[in-house]
Amino acid sequence: MSAGNGTPWDATWNITVQWLAVDIACRTLMFLKLMATYSAAFLPVVIGLDRQAAVLNPLGSRSGVRKLLGAAWGLSFLLAFPQLFLFHTVHCAGPVPFTQCVTKGSFKAQWQETTYNLFTFCCLFLLPLTAMAICYSRIVLSVSRPQTRKGSHAPAGEFALPRSFDNCPRVRLRALRLALLILLTFILCWTPYYLLGMWYWFSPTMLTEVPPSLSHILFLLGLLNAPLDPLLYGAFTLGCRRGHQELSIDSSKEGSGRMLQEEIHAFRQLEVQKTVTSRRAGETKGISITSI
């Protein structure tokens, strides 16, 4: 969405420098840009909530994912809606007429603009980061929790798991790596952009010292987080499938070895029984001959 709605307009705006479109286009662009940014921040949270539900409640219904997606898009729309009223075109008269799309005059005091920017920062960065940290922490704790080995002593109503699947360190390690990668990707993609933004908020004079292209590059880096998450999950899923295949092979080998040992043990017991029976028969025959 951000690539289709915001990036081409931004590229054209950077070429023309001033705003050449109408006022409604200015408001719409800034609304769509912020909505795309909100959705890029909220969708990884939805993925984290879905993964948490899949791990903690694997037999539960997955119908809640669509509701979470709808809530993420609806919340993105509502939080970006003020952009339609804050941004507008401003005309500067002079030897060279100039028009720009800005928020000049929308805030009566500097603290109001700073408060709005901090609120946006919390909704776009701090809250999603906290939510994902909680989700993936619960996933890691659930997967890393030591499982009671179930076998002949398993309580009634519980299934006995093969030993190759019980306490598998590879599954726990993959889950831990995935959680760390998701959080690290979100932090690396968005932190530079928001650090630069906070620098602007508390020191507006820095706007003249930092090239505008830097903020655009950092913004695109932040939006890169959205397509990276599905790639990480895809790589993790392929790794899990390979791991499950290896575990299946190991368990089948273990089962075959166990069956072979049981057959050897049964064969040895049969041989012992035959030997004992033949000895007893010989002793009985010897006693009968002696008595004669």
From Swiss-Prot:
Phosphorylated on the C-terminal cytoplasmic tail. One of its GO terms (biological process) is G protein-coupled receptor signaling pathway. Disulfide bonds join C26-C101. It is found in: Cell membrane. The keyword Membrane applies. The keyword Disulfide bond applies. Residues 1-28, 89-115, 199-216 are extracellular. Expressed in many tissues. One of its GO terms (cellular component) is plasma membrane. Coiled coil: none annotated. It is a multi-pass membrane protein. Keywords: Cell membrane, Disulfide bond, G-protein coupled receptor, Membrane, Phosphoprotein, Receptor, Transducer, Transmembrane, Transmembrane helix. Pfam families: 7tm_1 (PF00001). It comes from the Eukaryota. InterPro entries: GPCR_Rhodpsn, GPCR_Rhodpsn_7TM, GphnRH_fam_rcpt. GO terms for molecular function: gonadotropin-releasing hormone receptor activity. The chain crosses the membrane at residues 29-49, 68-88, 116-136, 178-198, 217-237. Its main location: membrane. Belongs to the G-protein coupled receptor 1 family. PANTHER family: GONADOTROPIN-RELEASING HORMONE II RECEPTOR-RELATED, NEUROPEPTIDE RECEPTOR-RELATED G-PROTEIN COUPLED RECEPTOR. This is Putative gonadotropin-releasing hormone II receptor. It comes from Homo sapiens (Human). The lineage of its organism: Eukaryota, Metazoa, Chordata, Craniata, Vertebrata.
